[in-house]
Amino acid sequence: MHWRIPRCVLSIVVGAVALFPAVSAAKRGNELFLSNPLTLRWQYTSDQTSNFTPATDTTTVYVPLADGTLVALDAGDGRLRWKAEAGGDFSAAPAVDERAVYVATQYAGADKNTMRGTLRALSKDTGITLWMRTLSAPLRGSLAVDGAGVFAGAASGNSYAFDKLTGRTLWVNQYADEFDGQPTVAGGRVYFGTVGGWLLALDQSNGNLMWRYRTRGAIRGPIAVANDSVFFGSADGFVYACRELSGKHVWKHRTGAAVEAVVALNGGVLASSLDNYAYFLSRKKGAMLWRQLLPGRIPARPVTASDGALFMPLSTDSAIVLSLKNGKPLNTLQLGEENNSSAAPIVTSDRVVLTTAHAVMAFAASR
């Protein structure tokens, strides 16, 4: 792989945010236990659901539809608050903060042979466009938002930081590899996985490359940072751990197929693999604590709580909760149809929200 020197446009200093705000089901003062009976509270029916994970600020769920529409649903009752045309097909999963929803789309260029991209900030209250940026290539995977910036990777090999108030480019780096993953912001760094198998740790303030680590498969899933270590999965079938500061290899653990997502928990590292198994590994050495076979491939990260983890296997009609202690099944949520969406489950204040082929469904504890 050939590396080009990063081209910094402008630098900023921004603070780190909590990792995976939508992954944990444990909420302050209102903890949701996944092993308890959960019932369907609302359902938004649509034949246009997509594989992109919705964004949430705990009170509203922002769902990107396949026809280029973003719908804002009340997290409590599923009521439609607003909908907005995004100006093209979605090319990445959205992100949300206290002010805006950030969406990436793609459209055909003037010659019809190339795809171009846009990045928009939409008002959370109305869906009105606050600003828009046009790009030479679509953004891919997912967007990540922090105190002052929006971070994303493009199909062209560009990694970006944008000012989230204006859309102005803060920095951009050009690499000879394609991005199609889920960037993570932690500890003053932004972590990007590439299709060519590289994990890049970039300085959050200016985009400078701090270190890189190579695997033998695409890195498309989320990256977890905890206790001075970085955990991630690769399409080469391994779960990896390396040092946060240096990128030095710590351990790797083989699974039977591509690893689509990892989550770092107090008791270990939870990994989802396309071999139909969920793996729970020790954080220190990567030793397998347990693994559990599920009835379908696991394409996305699970939702976790203190008592378990909820997975959305493909080609099944249910979501399954496994115990974090031993991997045994604890609960099942019936979806009413075979699931073929790779959108990850998310959590609002007290609800688990799931995307299926024809609906967005919210489950909560039985009253």
Please place each PLM-identified region on the residue numbering.
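Repeat-blade elements of multi-bladed beta-propeller folds
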Residues: S46-T69, F90-R120, R133-Y160, N173-L200, ...
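Aromatic (tryptophan-biased) beta-strands that constitute blades/sheets of beta-rich domains
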Residues: A26-S50, Y62, R79-A86, T118-R120, ...
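Bacterial N-terminal signal peptides
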Residues: V9-L19
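C-terminal region of N-terminal signal peptides and the immediate post-cleavage residues
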Residues: V23-A26, D236
